[in-house]
């Protein structure tokens, strides 16, 4: 008779993106202007906004840093649509993706924030690199 001692569970083992994602309340349409996005970012004290297309599907993520080149020219910022700017675009995370795999993808892409979408491309939330790291390390967040 062989006695097996229980194996310690690795921190983060079995976790998915759904376990770690946060809701995202701020979104902007891809046809909105750079000025409008900047107003929302400043007014809500945000670092990023999720961008959605005309059907409501996730188009990407825009940051203040990404808008900076357009904001230097006020006449340009008022006329340039978010869709014409360089911003983070897909592929995006999905809720059933393993959290360890998502962490690797975020590290390779150097992402601090990653949109999470459903199978139709609609925004479900965001994955924050700090939260992923904490959960995988086994720390309570």
Model-derived features with residue positions:
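Tandem CBS (Cystathionine beta-synthase) repeat/Bateman regulatory domains
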Residues: 1-141
């Amino acid at each position: 008779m062989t006695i097996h001692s229980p194996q310690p569970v690795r921190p983060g083992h079995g976790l998915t993106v759904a376990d770690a994602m946060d809701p995202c309340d701020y979104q902007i349409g891809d046809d909105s202007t750079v000025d409008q996005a900047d107003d929302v970012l400043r007014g809500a004290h945000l670092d990023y906004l999720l961008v959605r297309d005309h059907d409501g599907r996730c188009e990407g993520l825009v940051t203040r840093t990404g808008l900076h080149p357009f904001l230097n020219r006020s006449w340009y910022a008022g006329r340039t649509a978010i869709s014409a700017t360089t911003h983070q675009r897909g592929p995006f995370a999905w809720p059933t993706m393993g959290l360890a795999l998502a962490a690797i993808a975020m590290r390779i892409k150097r992402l601090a924030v990653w949109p999470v979408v459903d199978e139709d491309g609609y925004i479900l939330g965001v994955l924050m690199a700090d939260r992923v790291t904490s959960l995988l390390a086994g720390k309570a967040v």
